[in-house]
């Protein structure tokens, strides 16, 4: 019997087949005529893709039926190489919780009066409770950048 195969370009080719022929045989005949390897061919009939091991009779393909030939798309993206790091991973800093740590900012003098050891930043943007870092020659606020430099004794102005 004779069947038609419509290719991607719209060209229709005729094939002489038997209803007992497998889809593999049909693909081999298409390769002979068109030069397309069977592993890249996909044959569609009545909206279904034809599987290689089955026969034309399994799909009820009769004489003068038209099969549609489309090419197989090899999907997926290129495999990505695993990154190799030159340096070992940096260990994350673990916060140490110290109980009653706030006590280091205050001192109780002999009369029982509480005295602040660190200078508090007077800037309005910092808010209450922001202490200034005390360096050997200055007080510095890390939040707003305000700096008070100590006046050295005997220094000329």
Swiss-Prot record:
What's a Pfam family in this record? ubiquitin
Q: Show the Gene3D superfamilies listed in the entry.
A: 6.20.50.150, Phosphatidylinositol 3-kinase Catalytic Subunit, Chain A, domain 1
Q: Which Gene Ontology molecular-function terms are recorded?
A: mRNA binding; structural constituent of ribosome; zinc ion binding
Q: Does the keyword Repressor apply?
A: no
- PROSITE patterns listed in its UniProt record: UBIQUITIN_1, UBIQUITIN_2
Which residues form the Glycyl lysine isopeptide (Gly-Lys) (interchain with K-? in acceptor proteins) crosslink? 76
Q: Which sequence ranges does the entry mark as zinc finger (C4-type)? A: 121-144
Mind listing the UniProt keywords for this protein, alphabetically?
Cytoplasm, Isopeptide bond, Metal-binding, Nucleus, Ribonucleoprotein, Ribosomal protein, Zinc, Zinc-finger
Q: Which residues form the Ubiquitin-like domain?
A: 1-76
Q: Is-annotated flag, keyword Translocase? A: no
The miscellaneous annotation reads:
Ubiquitin is encoded by 16 different genes. Ubiquitin is generally synthesized as a polyubiquitin precursor with tandem head to tail repeats. Often, there are one to three additional amino acids after the last repeat, removed in the mature protein. Alternatively, ubiquitin extension protein is synthesized as a single copy of ubiquitin fused to a ribosomal protein (either eL40 or eS31) or to a ubiquitin-related protein (either RUB1 or RUB2). Following translation, extension protein is cleaved from ubiquitin.
Q: Which family does it belong to?
A: In the N-terminal section; belongs to the ubiquitin family. In the C-terminal section; belongs to the eukaryotic ribosomal protein eS31 family.
Record's protein name: Ubiquitin-ribosomal protein eS31y fusion protein
Q: Which organism is it from?
A: Arabidopsis thaliana (Mouse-ear cress)
Tell me what gene encodes this.
RPS27AB
């Amino acid at each position: 019997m004779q069947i038609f195969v419509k290719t991607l370009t719209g060209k229709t080719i005729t094939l002489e087949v038997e209803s007992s022929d497998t889809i593999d045989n049909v693909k081999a005949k298409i390769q002979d005529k068109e030069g397309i390897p069977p592993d890249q061919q996909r044959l569609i009939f009545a909206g279904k893709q034809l599987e290689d091991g089955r026969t034309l009779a399994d799909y009820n393909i009769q004489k003068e039926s038209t099969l549609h030939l489309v090419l197989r798309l090899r999907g997926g993206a290129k495999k990505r190489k695993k990154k190799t790091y030159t340096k070992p991973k940096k260990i994350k800093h673990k916060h140490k919780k110290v109980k009653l740590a706030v006590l280091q900012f205050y001192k109780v003098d002999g009369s029982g009066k509480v005295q602040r050891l660190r200078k508090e930043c007077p800037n309005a943007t910092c808010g209450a409770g922001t202490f200034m870092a005390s360096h050997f020659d200055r007080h510095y606020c890390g939040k707003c950048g305000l700096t008070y430099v100590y006046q050295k004794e005997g220094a000329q102005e």
